[in-house]
Regions:
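AMP-binding/adenylate-forming catalytic domain of the ANL superfamily
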Residues: 529-553
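Conserved AMP-binding A3 loop
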Residues: 39-41, 191, 200-227
Length: 560
C-alpha cells in the first residue's frame, strides 16, 4: 500500500469505520429512506444480526458474497456485515439478468447472495447458492405515506418478479436476522476482521476489453478515496465535514464505485446521514434535498439534466451547499454552465464540479476546483495523494504538452482483477521510476502549469449508457444465440454522453429473405428478455458481412 498524507485514520476496515461512527452518533439519523429515519443504533443492530446470520449459514472470512440490490437499508447493512466478518462484498447490478448473475457468481465462486424483489428470479437454478431476499418496502415508514408508497410499489413491480426456485436455500431478510439473533443467543462468538489491507469489495467493470472483470478493492483504498472528499472540503473550501449539519444524497447506485465510496462510505466515515434512493426519481430526490438540507450531491449528468429541466431546485436555499457535481459519464459543458447559474442564484458558495475516475482506483481520481468555473473539457486536477501523467499509448514513455494515455498513481489503486493476472498486468504497470501506475486506457491532455486534465477519447471498447457500463461482447454473444443471426457487432454512436448502441447483423442464410422490420422487432424483444435494458441496441442495421482487418479481427473503425 502506498504511503500518503492525511489526518484521517484510513488504516481500518470499512466495518471499523462504521462502528466508530455508530458509537459517536448512536441515536442520530444514519439513513433517510422514504420518509423513514433509521438511527445509527438501528443500523448497527441490522449489521450485527446480518453478520451473525451469515455465520450461521456457513459464510466465513475470505468468502465472496454477491450483493445484488439497489440503495436500500438492507443493501448497506449487508455490505458492512460482510466486511465485519472478513468476507468480500461482490457487487452486482440489481437488474442483472440470469446470464449476467450466473457469470458473476461463477467468476468469484460465491455460495451466498443478497437480492431484492426484482432481481430474485435471476438466481433461479443456482442450487449451490443460499439466497437472501430483501424487500424494497421492508423499511417504508409505518404511516399513511408508507402504506401508499407500498401499494404504489407493488403495482409498479407487478409481473416483474418471480421466486428463485432450485437454490440451496431461499430466505427473506427478516429470517436471516432471526437466525443471526439465535446464533448469538447460543453463545457463538462473532469474529471481527481487522486487516485494512484485505480485499473488501469486488466491483464488476470492463477492464481493458469488453469482458466484465472483478476489480478487487481493499479497505484502506476505499477509506482513502472517501476521505479525499473531506480533504477537498477542508483544504480547498476551508470548511469542515459536520455530521450535525451535513447530509448526503445517495442516489448513485452503490454497486458502482462512485456511489459505493463517494456517497455511501463518505457518509459512514464522517457520521453524516444519507438519504437512500433505490431508483432515481428527480422529484423525490429534490424533495429530500429540501427536507433534510442535503449539501453533498453527486449524480450522473442525466440526473442533473432532469432536475434542472423540471425546476425542482429553483429558488431553494443552497447557502450551506459544500459539494455538488457529476461524473460516471461525460459531463456536457452546457450542464456545468446551467448548474453554476442555479447555484449562484440559490446562494451557494461553490461551483458545480466534474469528476473523473475508474473503478480500478475505486472511483474519482480528479475533481474540478469547486472555487472556480471549470474550463471547458476539463475533468479536474488530481485529488490529494494522486499523481497523474500521460504516456505514449502502449508504452511507459511520458509525454508532455501533447495527448497521451492517462496514468494514475495513488493509494486507491485496485489489488488487481479477480483471478485474472494477465489483464491485471496490462493496466497495473511498473514504470522506470519504480512505481506501479494504472494505465487508464483514456487519451487525455495535462496542462503543465495548472495540472488541469482534459479528456480526449476512450480507448477501451466499453460504452456507458446513462452512466452504466455495457459490454459489447456480452451483447454480441447473447444475440448469436438467435437462429436468425449468423454474426453481429455492437458499436456506440452519437455524441459523448448521449451514446446509443448500434447492432450490425449478418443474417443466417435461412432467414436472408425474411422481412427486416419484423426481424428488428424480434431482435429488440429478444434483448429485452435476455439483456439489461441499457444493453439493448437502439439501432439495428443488416449487412452482408462484418468488415475485417488483415489479421481477421472485426474492423470497428469501418463500422463507425
Amino acid at each position: 500500500m502506498i504511503e500518503y498524507t492525511t489526518r484521517y485514520d484510513v488504516k481500518k476496515t470499512m466495518y471499523e469505520k462504521f462502528a466508530d461512527s455508530a458509537a459517536q452518533h448512536t441515536n442520530e439519523p444514519c439513513f433517510y429512506y422514504y420518509n423513514n429515519t433509521i438511527t445509527w443504533a438501528q443500523a448497527e443492530k441490522m449489521v450485527d444480526l446480518c453478520a451473525a446470520g451469515m455465520l450461521a449459514n456457513g459464510v466465513r472470512k475470505g468468502d465472496r458474497v454477491i450483493i445484488c440490490a439497489p440503495n436500500m437499508p438492507q443493501c448497506i447493512a449487508a455490505i458492512y456485515a460482510v466486511n465485519k466478518i472478513g468476507a468480500i462484498a461482490s457487487m452486482l447490478h440489481p437488474l442483472s439478468v440470469a446470464s449476467e448473475a450466473q457469470y458473476a457468481v461463477d467468476l468469484v465462486g460465491a455460495k451466498f447472495a443478497f437480492c431484492f424483489d426484482v432481481s430474485e428470479k435471476a438466481f433461479k437454478g443456482m442450487n449451490h447458492l443460499t439466497l437472501v431476499r430483501c424487500k424494497t418496502a421492508e423499511y417504508f415508514p409505518k404511516t399513511p405515506y408508507g402504506f401508499i408508497a407500498n401499494q404504489l410499489y407493488k403495482k409498479k413491480i407487478k409481473g416483474k418478479t418471480a421466486p428463485a426456485t432450485d437454490v440451496k436455500k431461499n430466505i427473506d431478510w427478516k429470517e436471516l436476522l432471526r437466525e443471526g439473533k439465535e446464533y448469538i443467543a447460543a453463545g457463538n462468538e462473532i469474529p471481527i476482521a481487522e486487516n485494512p489491507l484485505a480485499v473488501a469489495a469486488i466491483m464488476m467493470t470492463g477492464g481493458t476489453t469488453g469482458n466484465p472483470k472483478g476489480v478487487q478493492l481493499c479497505n484502506e483504498a476505499i477509506n482513502n478515496l472517501s476521505y479525499q472528499l473531506c480533504d477537498v472540503v477542508e483544504n480547498v473550501l476551508d470548511m469542515k465535514c459536520d455530521p450535525k449539519s451535513d447530509a448526503m444524497l445517495t442516489a448513485l447506485p452503490v454497486f458502482h464505485g462512485f456511489g459505493f465510496a463517494l456517497c455511501m462510505h463518505v457518509s459512514i466515515c464522517t457520521g453524516m446521514p444519507q438519504s437512500l434512493f433505490p431508483q432515481f426519481d428527480a422529484k423525490m430526490c429534490s424533495d429530500a434535498i429540501k427536507k433534510y438540507g442535503i449539501n453533498y450531491i453527486f449524480g450522473v449528468p442525466d440526473f442533473f439534466e432532469k432536475v434542472y429541466k423540471a425546476g425542482y431546485l429553483k429558488g431553494i436555499d443552497m447557502s450551506n451547499m459544500k459539494l455538488i457535481g457529476s461524473g460516471g459519464d461525460v459531463v456536457p459543458y452546457s450542464l456545468t454552465e446551467k448548474m453554476d447559474r442555479l447555484l449562484k442564484e440559490n446562494g451557494a458558495h461553490c461551483h458545480f464540479v466534474s469528476g473523473y475516475g475508474l473503478t480500478e482506483c475505486v472511483t474519482v481520481c480528479s475533481f474540478t476546483d469547486p472555487r472556480r468555473e471549470a474550463p471547458q473539457g476539463c475533468i479536474g486536477v488530481p485529488c490529494y495523494n494522486v499523481e497523474a501523467m500521460t504516456v505514449k499509448p502502449g508504452t511507459t514513455d511520458e509525454v508532455k504538452g501533447e495527448d497521451g494515455e492517462l496514468c494514475i498513481y495513488a493509494p486507491t489503486l485496485m489489488e488487481g482483477y479477480y483471478h485474472d493476472p494477465d489483464e491485471t498486468a496490462k493496466v497495473l504497470v511498473k514504470h522506470n521510476d519504480g512505481k506501479v501506475w494504472l494505465h487508464t486506457g483514456d487519451m487525455c491532455y495535462i496542462e503543465q502549469e495548472t495540472g488541469d486534465i482534459y479528456y480526449r477519447q476512450r480507448l477501451k471498447r466499453v460504452y456507458k449508457i446513462s452512466g452504466y457500463l455495457v459490454y459489447p461482447s456480452f451483447i454480441e454473444e447473447a444475440y448469436r444465440a438467435m437462429a436468425e443471426i449468423y454474426d453481429c457487432c455492437v458499436i456506440g454512436v452519437g455524441e459523448e454522453g448521449q451514446t446509443k448502441l448500434k447492432l450490425f447483423v449478418v443474417k443466417n442464410k435461412k432467414f436472408k429473405n425474411d422481412d427486416e422490420e419484423m426481424l428488428k422487432k424480434k431482435i429488440i424483444e429478444f434483448g429485452m428478455q435476455n439483456l439489461s435494458k441499457w444493453s439493448v441496441p437502439k439501432i439495428i442495421e443488416f449487412i452482408d458481412a462484418l468488415p475485417r482487418t488483415k489479421i481477421g479481427k472485426v474492423d470497428f473503425k469501418v463500422l463507425k
